Amino acid sequence: MPDNLPEAYNAVEWNNPDHEVLVCFASSWSDNGLETWAFALPTILVPFTGTGDFLSALVAAWYDPSASSNGMSPLATAVSKALLAVQQILLRTHIHALAQVTDTNDATADDVKSKAQVLRKRELRIIPERSLITEGGEGWPGSRVDWSNWA
């Protein structure tokens, strides 16, 4: 896990030892062989919709076969930037949803109507947080995977 996570990650208790970590891999093949990068991200254990489509769209938008950053392949660079934007938007969406909770039942809804209301509060805040996409950033830190020791 990166050392310098935003302070707001305390809102999701990412540093809890029982907390799940999501690992994303970006692999590409070139004349030099297989290159794989791994990115470890803290999970936000609440439902969101559209995250896969959003991540895919950002990777496609930022993929440039002639660009690389920090020794990463072009694909790993695009994935790194997309992961940073998605993580930041998910975190801000979650914090916004927490601020909208009006009673304890909002956080753990059981019936269909309540679940729909909870999900509406967790719609990705892409437009309000669009500066995270347009201004970009360096990207989410990753590590190159060495497959040479794997049999």
Positions of predicted regions on the chain:
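Short linear interaction motif-like sites in intrinsically disordered regions of transcription factors
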Residues: 15, 30, 63, 141, ...
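Conserved phosphate-donor
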Residues: 1-49, 83-86, 90-97
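Short, small-residue alpha-helix embedded
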Residues: 48-71
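Conserved active-site and cofactor/substrate-binding residues in soluble primary-metabolism enzymes
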Residues: 19, 50, 54, 73-81
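PLP-dependent amino-acid enzyme catalytic core
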Residues: 41, 61, 76-77
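A broad "ordered helical/assembly scaffold" signature
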Residues: 37, 58-59, 80
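Charged C-terminal helix
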Residues: 70-151
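Short, low-complexity intrinsically disordered segments
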Residues: 12, 35, 60, 138, ...
